[in-house]
């Protein structure tokens, strides 16, 4: 595990050529799990040189790479177990700071499937990682103004859950 700014930014050619490209029959890519922390703009005192948003874009375009961004410790634990049981390359990005618990212990996580955390009729906020809590807070504020907002945790960025997003549109 390392900072999200460094792994994709400095190692993209090794990740692409040595992890994602090799295939053996039906198996695409090697069975490597890449985990980073300090993702996004939430690195606190580590400063601007450690902030990144482009890591997601870099990893999404690599063939055979799957990208997940858990919202809380429960999601991290369950998704770590899930990806350990699925062959192929994965990129998991986590935040630096402690995040509030959003999911219950009984929540199931399926790679490629988002989770509707709150139903709503007027608008939808699809979020990932630490922004899921921000989306729930925004939905609470909108509710005070009579706006019913659906919130979706899109913890799988690649493959994205097109079905849940199309239903919400």
What are these regions (language model features)?
Residues 4, 38, 129-131, 155:
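Residue-level signal for short, function-critical loop segments
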Residues 12-13, 135-136, 162:
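Conserved strand-to-helix beginnings and helix N-cap segments that scaffold or border functional pockets
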Residues 73-76, 155-161:
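Short acidic loop-to-helix transition motifs that present clustered carboxylates
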Residues 118-121, 126-128, 133-140:
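Hydrophobic pocket-lining "lid/loop/helix" segments that shape and contact the acyl-thioester
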Residues 134-152:
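Short helix-loop-beta junction
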């Amino acid at each position: 595990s390392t900072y999200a700014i460094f792994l994709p930014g400095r190692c993209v050619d090794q990740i692409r050529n040595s992890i994602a490209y090799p295939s053996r029959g039906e198996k695409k890519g090697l069975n490597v799990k890449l985990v980073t922390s300090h993702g996004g703009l939430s690195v606190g005192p580590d400063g601007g040189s450690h902030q990144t948003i482009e890591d997601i874009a870099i990893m999404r375009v690599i063939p055979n790479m799957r990208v997940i961004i858990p919202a809380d410790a429960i999601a991290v634990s369950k998704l770590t177990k899930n990806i350990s049981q699925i062959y192929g390359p994965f990129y998991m990005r986590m935040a630096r700071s402690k995040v509030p618990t959003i999911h219950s212990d009984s929540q199931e996580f399926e790679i490629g499937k988002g989770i509707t955390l709150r139903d709503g009729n007027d608008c939808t906020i699809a979020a990932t990682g630490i922004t899921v809590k921000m989306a729930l807070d925004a939905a609470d504020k909108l509710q005070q103004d009579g706006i019913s907002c659906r919130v979706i945790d899109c913890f799988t960025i690649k493959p994205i859950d097109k079905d849940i997003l199309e239903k919400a549109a």
